[in-house]
């Protein structure tokens, strides 16, 4: 394990470093929200149909968009949630881990809310790349209609290439993400400035009264339009999830200095263009540019959407890693793609599942216009979950009274529920897709957690207290196991009981090592555990010791490195004369268990698909001994 300082939450120590991290945040954190101008205003205009949209409605729509950005992104995320961190880390599961420690009475409720938020985020990780890249590549149709039939194949090809290079890591190219996205935001702002003068009446959008008046006059149509207006803030969850990568200061600076002004200017420019040229409602973003600039803008937009997609994919990898370490999912293979950056990881199973999902969505919907109807539910749902968890965080971590927390967060929750309600009207048009994805992932995580709990209860009935076992083997008798030289390390989840693999070793091999270490690996409710707190050793007798290794939910659980650190600090053992004993369970579904039969089978399938603990914990393969047992659950 690298020293904890290597992967501590990011902090800028000087101005050049602060500027570099700010530019980096522009590329990674704001890539998704930066691609929203491609389709958000266009989709908001769509419910008004072929009769066209009135001037007051255009101003009202832009006003809604600007104030949604201000309230949801600026107030909730940039100013409020970026302060709600778990030792510098943000994100739904990071917040959940902290709350499960601070408020254990509500563990089940918060667990359900947390895995719902995580499941919705993974659904978003499938939809965002498909929608963003399709939106950008569709600009080619304005360059020449001949590209019409090639938009989908080109988009799918880009996605296949993007997911194919994940195993190589993004360290070499990620240095370009920030500068390219910065150029993208500058182009957004410049395009907006160039068109605001088309009709200065659009500046009335700064007045929130126009947003309220629009909703009041539009009635049910206005409520439906909220679903499209919400597209302006998709990607806001990335601000919070990437808190540990860049730190609060650079993320806030990037928003106020570059991103918010650029988005504001661009939406105002699109609105002014539609006011002066009503026919531009078909594609107000790309029609802002002259013909000679279309191809460069399409290429830049494609690059921006690829970067946005990369940020979402990386976020999904990080989220799944957290879920594994917190015990919400079985162990998947985790590959580290950088020798210096522990946060750069690649999960083959997750990568392949995301790619399959993205391609299926692209072929199902065929265009960004159709896919936009499926978008929004996952994002609004995740935001609602985050607000609920933030309410508990404010009470338990900051000591806010219930009244204060309600006064601050209830208006936000009500607003987000309105957006969620508007998006739910899209269910029949494709909105069912993120619900199905989230439902499947929630069921998977709930099944795994419940199955592991039932398995522990089942095996606990047969457990022998470690103290009782030690007393038994210390007795001199003709049936005592033969002592052999060397050290044996037995992995177990319950240090007070005798590991089943130790009992099996004595039963079948009739031997006991000279030194026996009962090893427990704990995942703390914090992102990273400092090296000084990595382990504790307790000597129980001349033959037995207890060793506990502690890792954070963002740590690489490298047991070999941790043991090497223990050896440096006085824990005497020789790795080449040490054997690691692991238990391998063959699970059998029972007719009567704590889970329905289908869930039993799902849990067993997940357990069978989990990566070998030897590989996951980085144990030396030639020193590992596995003993199996059959367990009926």
Swiss-Prot record:
It catalyses: K(+)(in) + H(+)(in) = K(+)(out) + H(+)(out). GO terms for cellular component: plasma membrane. The chain crosses the membrane at residues 18-38, 61-81, 109-129, 145-165, 173-193, 211-231, 255-275, 287-307, 345-365, 371-391, 405-425, 427-447. The keyword Metal-binding does not apply. GO terms for molecular function: potassium ion transmembrane transporter activity; symporter activity. InterPro entries: K+_transporter, K_trans_C, K_trans_N, Kup. Its main location: membrane. It is a multi-pass membrane protein. It holds the Pfam family K_trans. Keywords: Cell inner membrane, Cell membrane, Ion transport, Membrane, Plasmid, Potassium, Potassium transport, Symport, Transmembrane, Transmembrane helix, Transport. The keyword tRNA-binding does not apply. It is found in: Cell inner membrane. PANTHER family: LOW AFFINITY POTASSIUM TRANSPORT SYSTEM PROTEIN KUP, OSMOTIC STRESS POTASSIUM TRANSPORTER. Transport of potassium into the cell. Likely operates as a K(+):H(+) symporter. HAMAP family: Kup (MF_01522). Belongs to the HAK/KUP transporter (TC 2.A.72) family. This is Probable potassium transport system protein Kup 2. It comes from Sinorhizobium medicae (strain WSM419) (Ensifer medicae).
């Amino acid at each position: 394990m690298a020293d904890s300082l290597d992967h501590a939450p990011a902090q800028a120590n000087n101005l050049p470093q602060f500027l570099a991290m700010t530019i980096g945040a522009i590329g990674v954190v704001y890539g998704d929200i930066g691609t929203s101008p491609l389709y958000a205003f266009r989709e908001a205009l769509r419910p008004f149909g072929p009769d066209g949209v009135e001037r007051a409605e255009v101003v009202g729509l832009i006003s809604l968009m600007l104030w949604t950005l201000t309230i949801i992104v600026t107030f909730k995320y940039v100013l409020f949630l970026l302060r709600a961190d778990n030792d510098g880390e943000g994100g739904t599961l990071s917040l959940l881990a902290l709350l499960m420690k601070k408020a254990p009475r509500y563990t089940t409720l918060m667990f359900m809310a947390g895995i719902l938020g995580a499941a919705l985020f993974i659904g978003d990780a499938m939809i965002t790349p498909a929608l963003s890249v399709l939106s950008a590549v569709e600009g080619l149709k304005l360059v020449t209609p001949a590209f019409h039939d090639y938009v989908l194949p080109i988009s799918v090809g880009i996605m296949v290439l993007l997911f194919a290079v994940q195993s190589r890591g993004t360290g070499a190219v990620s240095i370009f993400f920030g500068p390219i996205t910065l150029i993208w935001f500058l182009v957004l702002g410049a395009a907006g400035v160039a068109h605001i003068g088309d009709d200065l009446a659009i500046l009335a959008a700064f007045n929130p009264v126009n947003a309220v008046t629009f909703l009041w006059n539009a009635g049910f149509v206005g409520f439906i339009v909220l679903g499209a207006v919400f597209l302006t803030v998709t990607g806001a969850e990335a601000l919070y999830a990437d808190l540990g990568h860049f730190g609060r200061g650079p993320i806030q600076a990037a928003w106020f200095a570059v991103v918010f002004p650029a988005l504001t200017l661009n939406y105002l420019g699109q609105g002014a263009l539609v006011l002066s040229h009503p026919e531009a409602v078909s594609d107000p973003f790309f029609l802002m540019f002259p013909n000679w600039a279309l191809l460069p803008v399409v290429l830049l937009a494609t690059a921006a959407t690829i970067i946005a997609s990369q940020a979402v994919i990386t976020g999904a990898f990080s989220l799944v890693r957290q879920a594994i370490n917190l015990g919400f999912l079985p162990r998947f293979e985790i590959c580290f793609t950088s020798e210096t950056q522990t946060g750069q990881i690649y999960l083959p199973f997750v990568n392949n599942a995301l790619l399959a999902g993205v391609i299926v969505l692209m072929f199902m919907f065929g265009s960004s216009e159709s896919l936009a109807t499926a978008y929004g539910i996952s994002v609004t749902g995740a935001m609602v979950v985050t607000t609920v968890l933030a309410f508990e965080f404010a009470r338990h971590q900051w000591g806010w009274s219930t009244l204060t927390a309600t006064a601050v967060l209830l208006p936000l929750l009500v607003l987000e529920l309105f957006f969620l309600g508007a998006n739910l009207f899209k269910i029949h048009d494709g909105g069912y897709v993120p619900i199905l994805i989230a439902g499947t992932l929630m069921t998977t995580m709930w099944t795994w957690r419940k199955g592991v709990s039932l398995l522990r209860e089942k095996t606990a009935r047969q457990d022998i207290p470690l103290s009782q076992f030690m007393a038994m083997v210390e007795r001199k008798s003709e049936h005592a196991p033969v002592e052999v030289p060397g050290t044996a390390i037995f992995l177990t989840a319950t240090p007070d009981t005798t590991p089943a693999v130790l009992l099996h070793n004595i039963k079948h091999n009739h031997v006991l090592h000279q030194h026996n270490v009962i090893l427990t690996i704990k995942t703390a409710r914090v992102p990273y555990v400092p090296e000084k707190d990595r382990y504790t050793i307790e000597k129980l007798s001349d033959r037995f010791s207890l060793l506990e290794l502690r890792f954070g939910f963002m740590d690489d659980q490298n047991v070999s490195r941790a043991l090497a650190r223990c050896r440096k600090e006085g824990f005497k053992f020789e790795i080449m004369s040490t054997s690691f004993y692991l238990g391998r369970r063959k699970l059998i579904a029972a007719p009567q268990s704590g889970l329905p039969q289908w869930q039993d089978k799902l849990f067993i399938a997940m357990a069978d698909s989990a990566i070998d603990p030897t590989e996951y914990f980085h144990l030396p393969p030639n020193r590992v001994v596995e003993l199996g047992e059959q367990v009926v659950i």
